[in-house]
Amino acid sequence: MVNVEVNEEYTFDVVPQTVNDYRVCKNILEWLKSNMENLTDNNNEKLFSKVNYGYNEQTLKGFGKKPVCDVYLTKTNYSDDFQHNHPSIIVSNIICSLKGNMNNAYIKAAELNDYLLQEFETNENFHTLELFEEDTPVRTIVGRTRVTDAEMKIIPQGKSYGVLVAFELEHTIL
């Protein structure tokens, strides 16, 4: 464990690499949010009524019949040898909540879970992310995305139930 003293006069320069790391993280969040907003059900209607940046307590409560979704980053991993001054892996989370009677909510959550796992596996939009910036050639920043964890949890809510569906994704940065 490293102890760090905070000096009120301390400032740091934002170097181009720090700004680039921020852009990569921001682009991954925007990419995930856009992908989740574009998912549709069997009737070609939007799957989620709302997609939020960051963890939101309201998501646990659910909003009506359609699920709500949160996307956020939880961790950035750097290479062990410290040769590269940028993250090698970024971990993100996607959380969705459904509400209804217990059987109905759980069946819908299981269907949503299966559907999202299938989308992560087969939809190319979830696999790689290319960065488009002005005056810069197109470059791929996420080479691979994989699901590292998926969880479903029942949350009693008065007379009805909420079912939380959560995914942890690991993005390999090039």
Question: In which residue ranges do the predicted regions lie?
Answer:
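C-terminal tail/extension regions appended to the core domain(s) of diverse proteins
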Residues: M1-D13, S160-L174
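Small/polar-rich, solvent-exposed N-terminal microdomains that initiate assembly or binding
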Residues: V2-H84, N125-R139
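Acidic-leaning, charged glycine-interspersed low-complexity segments
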Residues: N38-T40, V51, G64-C69, E111-T172
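Generic structural motif
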Residues: N56-Q58, T74-T76, S97-N101, Q157, ...
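Oligomerization/assembly interface segments of phage tail-like spikes and tubes
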Residues: N85-N103, K159-H171
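Long, charged/polar, surface-exposed segments that mediate recognition or autoinhibition
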Residues: I94, L98-L117, E121
